[in-house]
Structures are given as C-alpha cells and as structure tokens.
C-alpha cells in the first residue's frame, strides 16, 4: 500500500514561509563533534515564520521547571507565535529570578529585531543546570543568527546542530502530504540522546495525555512521577489549522511518540515540543480536526529519531 506521506528534504524549512539559522556564540564548551568549526560548536538557533502562526506546545511535568518553559507555557495560551530562539550548552534552569529575566531578554531582543510582539517569540534552552546564561554571548549570537536566517537546506542543518548536546547525530525530517485538497508540508528537528524520559503535557502538569493505542508495560506508569535530561523538538508546518485542533493533535501525537521514550529514566527541567502552523499551504481551516492532524504529527515525531 502506497503511503500518503512522502519524505522530502528541508527539515524545518521545507514548509512554505519558514526560515532558520544556527550559529556559534561560545555557550558550549570547546569540542570537535558535529557542528564544530575550529573547535567551536554551534549553540544558538532561530526558527522564524514569515507570517504569524498558530502555535501549540507540550512541556515537562517536572516540578522543577526552567524559565524558558514557563515563558512558553504563558505565551502558547494566546495561540499565536512567529519565532523561536533556542540555545544549547546552558539550560537556564535553577537560575532564580535572573534566569527568568534572561529568558525574557532573549525573546525581547529577537522581537525587536524582527518587529513583532514579544508575546509571539518563544524560547528553548538545553545544557548545564544551575548556571546563568552568558547573556553577552547569547545576545551577540541572536544578532549573528539573524544575518544568516534563510530557507536554504544548510540553514536547517545548522539549526539542528545548534540544539544538540550529547547527541551523536542530528535528528530531522520533513514530509509532504495532501490535506483539504492542498499539498501540505511538515518538518521537524529534535535533540535528546542519553538520560531522557519525556513526560510532557500541554499545561506542564500531570496527568499526562493518554496514548490512543494500548500502552506498553513501561508506558503504563504515566500517572507516576517519572524520574526524568532534555528532549527538545520543534515542528513547522504550512497547514492552516485552528489552535484548539492543533493542541488536540499535538497531545495525541506526543502521547504516541515522545512520551513513550525512556533512556536512563531521567526527566528534564526543560523538555519541550513546539509546533508552528502558518497556514501558507492554503487549505481550509474548517476541514481539519485534531484527530485528522495527529497522524502526520505522530509520523513526523516518530520519524525524527534515526533508525
């Protein structure tokens, strides 16, 4: 049977109207792994939609929640976002009031440069816990990333490299499918290798969403407090979809994918999945329900992880 989903190049810049970049700003320790250049590693990424997008998110249920997660929890309630700034090498977690100020400063700078409301900019961080962000580096990195922001394939590659920490390879995918008589594209990037056990919900609180299919024995513990390091995922799509339907679809997709993963059983303070849907595919919003859209989201989420 022929699949309705076609894997295509482009990752997060495959959908219409999305730009990305990944740069070096020296947050990470010097290294020679993927994304390194003369001993440096990319450690700051931008994902930007050319138009305001519908947004949905799923977040860690760890009682210790990092400032970037708290910021996203507040802002996704509005249902609209247009840009995401992500840094690696520092989780900005357990950093007190300064951590909150730094998360706000990251998004405020990007919003000013892109001439959009601060509420439309989201943030993600991963890396060392308990250390404040080197904001001079972060701010310089944001300005640098804006100069190379583009829809070129290498820009998506640079973005996924910039969110990696202990990952041994980049995790990214893009798919194309028909929806409402229009061709729709969806792309995703993800990071997370050792010490992960995502247990995410839309509110950052338990209980977790229930998988549509019967859970495995290990998944039956979803009501317990998992012993959860950081899993980040960012998905872009040019589908037009209402915020309520996107939230429902993402909850189902995460329940059937990321919330079933465990490596060493460690949950992060920063686990986050964000989806931006900018509507540029031109399909009718009224034809999409959460249950219909969860299938491509589930496939994209599951396909990000390399075999």
Annotate each PLM feature.
Residues 54-77, 167-175:
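Glycine-rich oxoanion-binding loops at beta->alpha junctions
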Residues 64-75, 100-114, 247-260, 298-307:
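Short, well-ordered amphipathic alpha-helical segments that serve as non-catalytic structural scaffolds
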Residues 202-226, 287-296:
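Intrinsic disorder/low-complexity segments
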Residues 104-105, 109-204, 224-255:
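Glycine-rich, mobile lid/loop segments that gate access to catalytic sites or pores
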Residues 32-37, 187-199, 262-270:
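Conserved phosphate/anionic-ligand binding catalytic regions in large, soluble enzymes, centered on
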Residues 1-60:
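N-terminal amphipathic/basic leader segments beginning at the initiator methionine
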Residues 84, 88-97, 119-140, 262-284:
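Short, surface-exposed loop/turn segments at secondary-structure boundaries that line and modulate
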Residues 273-307:
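A glycine- and small/hydrophobic-rich beta-loop-beta segment
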């Amino acid at each position: 049977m022929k699949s309705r989903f076609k894997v295509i190049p482009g990752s997060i810049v495959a959908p219409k109207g999305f730009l990305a970049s990944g740069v070096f700003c020296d947050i990470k320790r010097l290294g020679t792994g993927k994304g390194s250049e003369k001993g440096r590693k990319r450690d700051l990424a931008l994902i930007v939609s050319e138009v305001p997008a519908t947004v949905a998110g799923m977040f860690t249920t760890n009682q210790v929640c990092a400032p970037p997660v708290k910021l996203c929890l507040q802002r996704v309630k509005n249902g609209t976002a247009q840009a995401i700034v992500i840094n690696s090498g520092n989780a900005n977690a357990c950093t007190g009031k300064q951590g909150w100020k730094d998360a706000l400063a990251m998004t405020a700078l990007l919003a000013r440069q892109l001439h959009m409301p601060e509420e439309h900019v989201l943030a993600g961080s991963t890396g060392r816990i308990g250390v404040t962000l080197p904001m001079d580096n972060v701010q310089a990195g944001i300005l640098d990333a804006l100069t190379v922001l583009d829809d070129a394939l290498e820009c998506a590659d640079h973005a996924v490299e910039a969110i990696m920490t202990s990952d041994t390879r980049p995790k990214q995918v893009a798919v194309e499918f028909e929806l409402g008589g229009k061709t729709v594209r969806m792309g995703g990037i993800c990071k997370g290798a050792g010490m992960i056990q995502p247990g995410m919900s839309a509110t950052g609180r338990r209980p977790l969403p229930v998988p549509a299919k019967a859970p495995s024995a290990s998944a039956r513990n979803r009501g317990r407090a998992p012993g959860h390091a950081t899993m980040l995922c960012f998905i872009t799509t040019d589908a037009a979809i209402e915020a309520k339907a996107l939230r429902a679809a993402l909850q189902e997709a995460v329940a059937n994918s990321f919330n079933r993963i465990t490596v060493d059983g460690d949950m992060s303070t920063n686990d986050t999945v964000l989806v931006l849907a900018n509507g540029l595919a031109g399909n009718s919003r009224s034809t999409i329900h959460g249950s219909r859209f969860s299938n491509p989201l589930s496939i994209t989420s599951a396909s990000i992880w390399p075999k």
